[in-house]
Amino acid sequence: MGQPNVPLVAVVGPTASGKSDVGVALAHLLEREHGRPGEVVNADAMQLYRGMDVGTAKLTPAEREGVPHHLLDVLDVTETAEVARFQADARAAVEDVTARGGLPLLVGGSGLYVRAAVDDLRFPGTDPEVRARWEAELAVLGPHALHARLAERDPAAAAKILPGNGRRIVRALEVGELTGRPFAASLPEQTYLRPTVQVGLAVPREQLDARIDARVERMWAAGLVAEVRDLEARGLREGRTASRALGYAQVLDAFDGTTTEDEARELTARLTRRFARKQESWFRRDPRVHWLPAPDGSDPLDLARRVLELLPVASAA
């Protein structure tokens, strides 16, 4: 039997589509049938954070079934998740797994993080003074007014960034000022850094929505509120990215009394359903992704076998 002959496999798709379980099943399958162990490299931005476990549906050590997982629990909640830093760390993890004879499996649904790991792209640098100036403008004017300013300077970028997304608006203005080029010019091109097979898990919309609703209920039952309370004591509110994570932001609002816990749970489910649609739209725009139907009742091992069938093989000597 030929060996899988590809340097990197990515399992992508929306939240609650079953990526994590397929990643574990694929890792076992590779070792059992090909003698080449698979190791997972996380590509979920919020799973980078230590202690953000319940609300991110992070696999427990037992659920990882002995499969090595990289880039989980590498940031404190007070740290900002930066895609450029992730890119360097993910590429280092891929090279490490490969050097030891394994097959790296990039697993996650954070679209830009996946692209940063698999594609040949370079992110513009940042300047703290320029960033601080635009953030001060954001604080005074608000995101909608700053979005109007971006529209004057870079209409193409403004058309792709929601008026309420202050962080991305600031970044687009910063990049434009530093490079003198449109923000879109710095976005990733679809050119692989190394040969890669990307596989997306496609779940019917109604089924995915139901999975998300059930997952949110399980998170609350599993202690999400207590997890957020613990992380609050460790500086969660100071974290620019961690404090905005779905579920965590809503529970913090409940702590503040601006919403009830029931309302926070319902809002988390609604926003997660919306987020899943955005994730799928992102990955659907990439024609290189091979989509596998993954409806309710799909066996992760069966899906892993179908992923394996998509991989090019090298003939045995």
UniProtKB/Swiss-Prot annotation:
Instruction: Supply the alphabetized keyword list.
Output: ATP-binding, Magnesium, Nucleotide-binding, Transferase, tRNA processing
Supply the Gene3D superfamilies for this chain.
1.10.20.140, P-loop containing nucleotide triphosphate hydrolases
Cystine pairs: none
Please give the catalytic activity noted in the UniProt record: adenosine(37) in tRNA + dimethylallyl diphosphate = N(6)-dimethylallyladenosine(37) in tRNA + diphosphate
* GO MF term set: ATP binding; tRNA dimethylallyltransferase activity
Enzyme Commission number(s) = 2.5.1.75
Tell me which residues bind substrate: T15, A16, S17, G18, K19, S20
Entry-linked SUPFAM superfamilies: P-loop containing nucleoside triphosphate hydrolases
**Which prosthetic group or cofactor does it need?**
Mg(2+)
Site, Interaction with substrate tRNA: residue positions: S110, R131
- Known Pfam families for this protein? IPPT
Which residues bind ATP per the record? G13, P14, T15, A16, S17, G18, K19, S20
Q: Which InterPro entries match?
A: Dimethylallyltransferase, IPT, P-loop_NTPase
Question: Which EC main class describes this enzyme?
Answer: transferase
**GO biological process annotations for this chain's record?**
tRNA modification
Q: Which domain of life is it from?
A: Bacteria
User: What does this protein's UniProt record list under function?
Assistant: Catalyzes the transfer of a dimethylallyl group onto the adenine at position 37 in tRNAs that read codons beginning with uridine, leading to the formation of N6-(dimethylallyl)adenosine (i(6)A).
Summarize subunit and interaction data from the UniProt record for this chain: Monomer.
Protein name (record):
tRNA dimethylallyltransferase
Which organism encodes this protein? Kineococcus radiotolerans (strain ATCC BAA-149 / DSM 14245 / SRS30216)
